[in-house]
Regions:
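RecA-like P-loop NTPase motor core of helicase/translocase proteins
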Residues: 1-605
């Protein structure tokens, strides 16, 4: 395996065409050769090999592109050929020197010129972000004017959606994590809105947008897509020319999470009372919302708009499973894998059912899926890890690494934990999973000892912390105003609480009712000072569903310590909502989400 790639992975500018790439061998490992052309869309992820290699099948490689007979006439499992073909057309179209040759509206042409050539004062769009939007524009405005050459792409999309999403038309834009999906969303909204406002009779464009996220924390971060947000991308990142900002203000945008699509009870009736009434009337009492009532609750701003565009963030959670095959798949799974499959399907079912309701009641022209991993999940009834067949653009992690957009992921090739031929840190969960706490943070969760976590996990934390400590010191010496961020992702809330306590400190309860402090084992992450007092501005925060609801990860003195930042947050809320009372009462859960969303930002919570 070549070390050249790992020593010097960056070949291209993030703002220009990625005209070079590292060659990969048959096993997906980098060679010494740099090829003077763009990388084709292939689903290969190069990482350093362990000292002892396992077979490709054991490593869980994607089966895309194999000869296993996964594709049918109705459902393609390997859309990468169509992605490369679309890419070729878009590149030729982009190279046309005269905007009159672009076959787009004057407004679209102006936006394209702005994104490609404007001298941005701040953050400039990456090539991959512009390309994703160019792909959407080309498929919408250009391809229909090319006769049979363009019709084949519409036919592909219709066929890909017919089986998986019969009520919807979806286009997936695949962007590596860190490549900036939010900016792409802002550009899509700008393109649609400006055209819809200036061509009100056109059925091709819309100024109504439903943005769906998988959770409230992601939803909060997407608020920069609202035109009236203090940090709105349209103005602060110059997504549109100044004279188009007034058009953007006419956009109707709703940002929600998929949970909002669940039909709610309109009347609270006790179980016994319900049974008595239903027995007397001999019919079921309908107390659930109708679809129309749900939509009125979730998106009242969009109720008068007939052509809505949906933007799905982290869209791999949204699909219509094959019911028979999904049941068979779940039957083959056991334990946590079976629970995961059921949870995946429940999430997907609620998400896509909500979009189908929007289509039936209001009208929906297009769904744009944005995800780094637009793959079918376990239990979907499709082959796990197969790409959504309506994926039409791809900027992979390897592309992002070669353009310097994301750092090279580091995975262990060796460790100092004795036993075994392969590094345990490489697949840590395989070695500690059965010894980790199960789901839930009830009474049993409180009796678990953070200092009794598996040795392999504690050793991994110490190893990563050692690297963090060196980076922290370098940043301090260079005068960087914020510390680097250390993120630990856990499988459930019990595990996250134990790791949190191990890292930051906790009070141990004794049999006689007294407590004693066990300070955090990683000094820079401690939430207690040397005298055992809790630090008002914590070095470590715990973010999970329970914490977001309770908000109890923040010390009572935090509000006083962060008074200036909290006041700035109140003003932001008022500007964002145009409600003078929005900042009067900020609950701890909202405050905790804001803390998480502004980690690493100066003068923020």
């Amino acid at each position: 395996m070549s070390q050249s790639f790992f020593e010097r992975p960056i070949l291209n500018s993030p703002y220009g065409y990625p005209g070079q790439h590292w060659e990969l061998d048959a096993d997906g490992q980098p060679t010494d050769r740099i090829l003077p052309m763009r990388r084709r869309s292939d689903l290969i992820t190069p990482v350093p090999k362990p000292k002892k290699r396992r077979s490709k099948r054991e490593q869980g490689q994607f089966v895309l592109g194999s000869d296993d007979g996964l594709s049918t006439a109705e459902q393609e499992y390997n859309p990468t050929p169509i992605i490369n073909e679309v890419r070729t057309h878009v590149e030729a179209w982009r190279a046309l020197p005269n905007p009159d040759q672009w076959l787009v509206s004057p407004e679209t042409a102006r936006l394209l010129q702005h994104w490609r050539h404007h001298s941005f004062q701040g953050v400039k769009p990456f090539f991959c972000q512009i390309e994703a939007v160019e792909t959407a524009i080309w498929l919408s405005e250009v391809a229909p004017k090319l006769g049979p050459r363009g019709a084949k792409f519409r036919a592909h999309l219709e066929g890909a959606n017919a089986q998986a999403n019969p009520e919807l038309m979806r286009i997936a834009l695949k962007l590596a994590t860190g490549a900036g999906k939010t900016t792409v969303m802002a550009m899509l909204i700008a393109w649609q809105t400006v055209n819809a406002v200036r061509h009100p009779n056109s059925r091709q464009f819309s100024r109504g947008f439903l943005i769906v996220a998988p959770g409230i924390t992601i939803r909060d971060r997407l608020r920069v897509l609202m035109p009236n947000d203090p940090e709105s991308y349209y103005k602060h990142r110059e997504i549109v020319p100044a004279d188009m900002l007034a058009d953007i203000d006419r956009a109707k945008i709703v940002i929600t999470n998929y949970h909002a699509f669940k039909l709610r009870e309109r009347v609270d009736i006790a179980k016994g009372t319900r049974a008595a009434i239903e027995g007397w009337r001999e019919e079921k009492i309908q107390t659930l919302e109708t679809e129309g009532q749900m939509l009125q609750r979730v998106m009242p701003e969009l109720m008068g708009i007939k052509r809505i565009v949906v933007l799905n963030d982290e869209a791999h959670h949204c699909y219509r499973e094959r019911v028979r095959d999904a049941v068979e798949t779940e039957a083959e799974l056991k334990g946590e894998e079976k629970d995961e499959a059921k949870e995946n399907n429940q999430t997907a079912r609620m998400w896509i059912s909500g979009l189908e309701a929007v289509k039936r009641k209001l009208g929906l022209t297009m769904v744009y899926d944005l995800s780094a991993t637009p793959f079918f999940l376990r239990g979907s009834g499709y082959v796990e890890g197969t790409l959504f067949p309506w994926t039409m653009s791809d900027f992979s992690l390897m592309d992002a690494i070669e353009c310097g957009i994301v750092k090279l992921p580091r995975v262990p090739v060796a460790d100092n934990v004795p036993g075994g031929d392969t590094p345990k840190f490489r697949n840590l969960w395989d070695h500690i999973g059965k010894r980790m706490p199960k789901k839930g943070r009830g009474a049993s969760g409180r009796t678990l000892d953070p200092l009794s976590l598996p040795t392999e996990l504690l050793t991994a934390l110490e190893a990563l912390y050692g690297h963090y400590e060196k980076t922290f010191e370098m940043w301090r010496e260079e005068g960087i105003g914020v510390p680097p961020v250390f993120i630990v992702v856990c499988n459930n809330t019990s595990a996250s609480e134990l790791v949190y306590k191990y890292v930051s400190g906790f009070h141990r309860e004794h049999d006689d009712g007294t407590t004693s402090l066990e300070n955090g084992r990683l000094a820079l992450f401690r939430n207690y000072d040397d005298y055992g007092n809790r630090i008002a501005r914590p070095n470590t925060i715990l973010i999970d569903s329970a914490q977001l609801e309770s908000g109890d990860a923040l010390d009572k003195g935090f509000r006083e310590m962060a008074a200036d930042e909290l006041d700035r947050f109140r003003r932001d809320l008022i500007d964002r909502t145009r409600d003078q009372h929005a900042g009067d009462s900020i609950d701890d859960a909202t405050l905790l989400r804001e803390v998480m969303n502004t980690v690493g930002k100066k003068e923020r919570l």
